[in-house]
């Protein structure tokens, strides 16, 4: 059972930029369920995608794994044998807790949890790569290179799951979905103070792209097929496929 997120329920004098530190890791499951609409659905459906795409004797990468929710969903649903999951995060607090979460569940598929910069991790023999609300924390000029690396490391017939918060070219649509997201957070018990303080901390470190921009990058990386498979307000997930057969 995770602790309830009350990190920003009182005024913070010097907010600074957002970091995934010990305090955030401690309340992260509650925070993300109450902040990201559709998160639980995305996690469970990543497991369904894993059942379809993970190939025999291949590797799965969960880049920006946080506490390992996507990794556990993948591991529960893998039917192929001889696979290995590599879960990567650059937050020591997240990695420590992720290892504990993974170790709490028995399964045949081994998981290696690595504390590292996802931009420096080689992608090899991969049949599935998960980027779950991670790319948006890289500088925009670094995003294409990571997608290129992922495509190069994927086996033919492999897939990338890319979940992100989106911006919108249509300002009216963007404003509506932005407001709906805030309604969602209010309905989940967050106060105006909590919402505004968190937004202030995130605005310099989480820079969102439109779905169109994501699709353009994926095409440039080499993915011949990429489409939005899930969306709730201004959050969603794309699946990108590498051509060929396993």
Curated annotation (Swiss-Prot):
<comment type="function">
    <text>Catalyzes the conversion of S-adenosyl-L-methionine (SAM) to carboxy-S-adenosyl-L-methionine (Cx-SAM).</text>
</comment>
<feature type="binding site">
    <location>
        <begin position="64"/>
        <end position="66"/>
    </location>
    <ligand>
        <name>S-adenosyl-L-methionine</name>
    </ligand>
</feature>
<feature type="binding site">
    <location>
        <begin position="89"/>
        <end position="90"/>
    </location>
    <ligand>
        <name>S-adenosyl-L-methionine</name>
    </ligand>
</feature>
<dbReference type="GO" id="GO:0016743">
    <property type="term" value="F:carboxyl- or carbamoyltransferase activity"/>
</dbReference>
<dbReference type="Pfam" id="PF13649">
    <property type="entry name" value="Methyltransf_25"/>
</dbReference>
<feature type="binding site">
    <location>
        <position position="132"/>
    </location>
    <ligand>
        <name>S-adenosyl-L-methionine</name>
    </ligand>
</feature>
<comment type="similarity">
    <text>Belongs to the class I-like SAM-binding methyltransferase superfamily. Cx-SAM synthase family.</text>
</comment>
<feature type="binding site">
    <location>
        <begin position="117"/>
        <end position="118"/>
    </location>
    <ligand>
        <name>S-adenosyl-L-methionine</name>
    </ligand>
</feature>
<dbReference type="InterPro" id="IPR005271">
    <property type="entry name" value="CmoA"/>
</dbReference>
<keyword id="KW-0808">Transferase</keyword>
<dbReference type="InterPro" id="IPR029063">
    <property type="entry name" value="SAM-dependent_MTases_sf"/>
</dbReference>
<dbReference type="GO" id="GO:1904047">
    <property type="term" value="F:S-adenosyl-L-methionine binding"/>
</dbReference>
<feature type="binding site">
    <location>
        <position position="199"/>
    </location>
    <ligand>
        <name>S-adenosyl-L-methionine</name>
    </ligand>
</feature>
<feature type="binding site">
    <location>
        <position position="39"/>
    </location>
    <ligand>
        <name>S-adenosyl-L-methionine</name>
    </ligand>
</feature>
<protein>
    <recommendedName>
        <fullName>Carboxy-S-adenosyl-L-methionine synthase</fullName>
        <ecNumber>2.1.3.-</ecNumber>
    </recommendedName>
</protein>
<keyword id="KW-0949">S-adenosyl-L-methionine</keyword>
<dbReference type="GO" id="GO:0002098">
    <property type="term" value="P:tRNA wobble uridine modification"/>
</dbReference>
<dbReference type="InterPro" id="IPR041698">
    <property type="entry name" value="Methyltransf_25"/>
</dbReference>
<comment type="subunit">
    <text>Homodimer.</text>
</comment>
